Amino acid sequence: MRVIGLTGGIATGKSTFAALLRARGAPVVDADALARAAVEPGTPALAEIARTFGAEVLRPDGALDRKALGARVFADPGARRRLEAITHPAVRLAMREETARLAAQGHPLAFYDTPLLYEVGLEALLDAVVVVWAPRDVQRERLMRRDGLGGAEADARLAAQLPVDEKAARADFVVENAGAPEALAGKADRLLADLRGGRGRRLPNAPPVRY
């Protein structure tokens, strides 16, 4: 089974596109949900986090206190690397297990929906990457309208992310979503046809396939 990464930027329409893929019978796995499950109470990863960072990163019920952990690692690159050394292998194991489950069901391909695909280095585990892209001014306008933000707030949120143009430059497939949402349906059909037909990683120095 082929494993395809699906990512994008804030307000580019990735979630809408993921829903279109699901509606067409393609499994779309929420990679963030896998990451949360990997550090649930009773998991080896959570036990290692507590040993590394102390019991203060746990809530009274034994669950991970994400706010407390975030405060520990936000401004400390060394602490962040120690955390990633624990969580990344756990997430990769969860991905392999989910991939095996879907393959056993006979699916020829599956998508992993993850906003931070490039930021956490997941592309090495994937057969291809799809980026849902929109111009920055469109992202900004959508973000302001969707979340009721002012321009400065929207700009700050966009600045906190890896630019979607950079993600698109690294992708194998780019789904352009600057227009009306209904235009995405045909693009989902074309992407699935290409992937089911065997299209995958682009050649070095070749541009991504754009829809």
Swiss-Prot record:
Chain positions recorded as ATP binding sites: 11-16
GO cellular component, one term: cytoplasm
Pathway: Cofactor biosynthesis; coenzyme A biosynthesis; CoA from (R)-pantothenate: step 5/5
GO terms under biological process: coenzyme A biosynthetic process
This enzyme's EC code(s): 2.7.1.24
UniProt xrefs under SUPFAM superfamilies: P-loop containing nucleoside triphosphate hydrolases (SSF52540)
A Pfam family it matches: CoaE
Function: Catalyzes the phosphorylation of the 3'-hydroxyl group of dephosphocoenzyme A to form coenzyme A.
HAMAP family linked: Dephospho_CoA_kinase
Name the record gives this protein: Dephospho-CoA kinase
Gene: coaE
